[in-house]
A protein has these predicted regions:
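Buried hydrophobic-core signal for structured, non-transmembrane domains
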Residues: 50, 116-120, 225
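Short solvent-exposed loop/turn micro-motifs enriched in small/polar/acidic residues
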Residues: 37-40, 68-72, 98-102, 130-131, ...
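Extended, loop-rich substrate-binding clefts of extracytoplasmic carbohydrate-active enzymes
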Residues: 56-111
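Active-site/ligand-binding surface loops and adjacent short beta/alpha elements
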Residues: 127-129, 137-208
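Beta-strand-rich N-terminal accessory domains
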Residues: 1-53, 189-208
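Beta-strand-rich recognition/accessory modules
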Residues: 26-28, 93, 102, 179-239
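Acidic, contiguous internal or C-terminal segments within carbohydrate-active enzymes
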Residues: 1-4, 89-130, 134-138
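A short, structured loop/turn motif at beta-sheet edges
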Residues: 7-10, 46-51, 78-85, 108-113, ...
Length: 239
């Protein structure tokens, strides 16, 4: 688990003691990477060579395929030091996602920061659409709130029409009041997250991640704040 040591407070949601580490129990972890895309891929929306197809469902708790292969497969340790670790995952393109790729993920502790880096390398013979997402989970409290520069999202006004819309005018979103599953556009790469009255943190991205996804489901004791390169339902929206 990832904790604030001096106060023994969970930063990421702790893995349940009554669960075993397994492929499908990644759903209950405190963090995972989403590669080679973030979000769901609905039926007949994935466009290899401009032919729209469906991908196989990849998780028993989800109605459609979601978040790619990285979050439900083992990663190999390629490097390790006393304050960092590098993990590698290779997908051969033969099952579900039809392209081969190599993902690399590093975790580094520096002063009071956890630095997570993800890279994605195309090792297929063909070009393909891809994306990256950082998917941490946090425990919800009455104080949980995200301060960010943009709460602009794509709002569906007709079956085939989307427009940019602001969810709220202020720069603070109350995670108890707003129960949403939405990608916010034009993120400037820096947000302040208040988890509870004793714990807050700064989420930063140096470059190339322009969206911030907020998942705050009703009647649940958790939420997710996710820096992502592609918006939710990206292939459906593109189609």
């Amino acid at each position: 688990s990832f904790k604030e040591k001096s106060k023994n407070l969970d930063i990421f949601r702790a893995f349940p003691a009554n669960k075993k580490i397994s492929k499908f129990n990644s759903y209950f972890t405190g963090y995972f990477a989403t590669v080679p895309y973030f979000g769901a891929v609905h039926e007949n929306t994935f466009p290899p060579k401009n032919n729209y197809i469906s991908l196989m469902k990849n998780h028993i708790l989800e109605p459609v395929t979601i978040h790619g292969e990285g979050w439900i497969n083992k990663w190999d340790v390629s490097k390790q030091t006393k304050n960092s670790i590098e993990l590698v995952f290779k997908h051969n393109g033969k099952k579900n996602y039809p392209y081969a790729y190599k993902a690399k993920q590093t975790f580094k502790l520096k002063n009071k920061s956890l630095i997570i880096s993800i890279s994605l390398e195309n090792i297929d013979k063909d070009f393909f659409y891809c994306g990256i997402g950082f998917h941490p989970w946090f425990n919800l409290s009455e104080f949980s709130k995200i301060h960010s520069n943009s709460f602009t999202y794509l709002k569906k006004i007709k079956k085939e029409k989307l427009i940019k819309s602001k969810m709220l005018k202020s720069n603070a979103l109350d995670l108890n009041k707003y129960k949403i599953d939405e990608t916010f556009l034009d993120w400037n790469g820096k947000s302040k997250l208040i988890i509870n009255k004793n714990l807050s943190l700064i989420i930063k991205n140096k470059n190339n991640v322009n969206n911030l996804h907020v998942f705050s489901p009703p009647k649940k004791n958790f939420f997710c704040i996710e820096p992502v390169t592609n918006i939710r339902d990206a292939f459906y929206t593109k189609k």
